[in-house]
Amino acid sequence: MAGIYAVSIKGHASAIFNRQEKEISTGRVWEVMKKIMSLKPTRVIMSYSLLRSALDKSRQLTQEEYNIMQLILDGCVKTLEPVAASGICIDVNLGKCTKHTIPFGITNNDVGHVSVVMTLPFLEEGCYNIGACFDGRLSKSRSDASHYAVDVSLEIYLKSLSRDEAEEQISKGTSVYPFKINHPTYFEDETDTSDGESLSGRASSDDGPEDGGHGHGDKNNEKNSGKVVRKRKSRKEIDVGRFKMVKDNIINTRSGLLKSMRGTGHRKHRTQEITEGYNYGDKDAE
């Protein structure tokens, strides 16, 4: 069952290369370290104990627990953005090399750790330990090999919090990582979609009449509403209508002129001019 936790991390994670590397960001260092550890998962030691001071750390983490631990560390790196320390060092196996270290906190006493509040799925309260110390070669060609070494020692302590306790921690400046939003697949069993479906259905039915759309069950209402839905005319229909209106105006004008000229000597001549004009208009319209 999901719960709110205060995640406290102590320790460090270091990646060492025998080649001179340019200064890289903390996020990039962590991504490289995750990739290297995924190449040799059996060399990564993971254990759990209820208390930090407990000597028995024999219970090994399951693969799913380890995956969640990696996501927790991802969230802490993104949220806290600790500055990676880079420098030249001498390694027993690699010789002169470049070392990039992400400092999460000191491990001497119960101080110096970094903390983040987040909602997590089905994890026990207690201390999770991740350790790794090995070296290897990245490139396949021996003549152009890039050697590396990994040194990881992390202690991740989870403490369950009530909502009031979490809000108190946040008010004191503790950072928050939205784990549930960024990794929803771990919470699918707890997601209640009934409210969302009812809200979306209600929204569609409410918005239907306003924008002229058809919501569920709106067709019968439209039949009984007595409203006439006008079909939009095409451009061709509009042009034909305009021509008909002009034609009717010409006929009415001709009739009026014929009446006014009735009894004059110019009746025949004016009638012929008007008739020719009307025929010319019909020809253009065609």
Curated annotation (Swiss-Prot):
Keywords: Phosphoprotein
Tree of life domain: Viruses
Keyword Phosphoprotein carried by entry: yes
Residue ranges with Basic and acidic residues bias: 211-225
Region of interest called Disordered, as start-end residue ranges on this chain: 187-234, 257-286
Physiological role: This protein is probably a component of the active polymerase. It may function in template binding.
Name of this chain's protein: Phosphoprotein
Species, as recorded: Sonchus yellow net virus
Lineage of origin: Viruses, Riboviria, Orthornavirae, Negarnaviricota, Haploviricotina
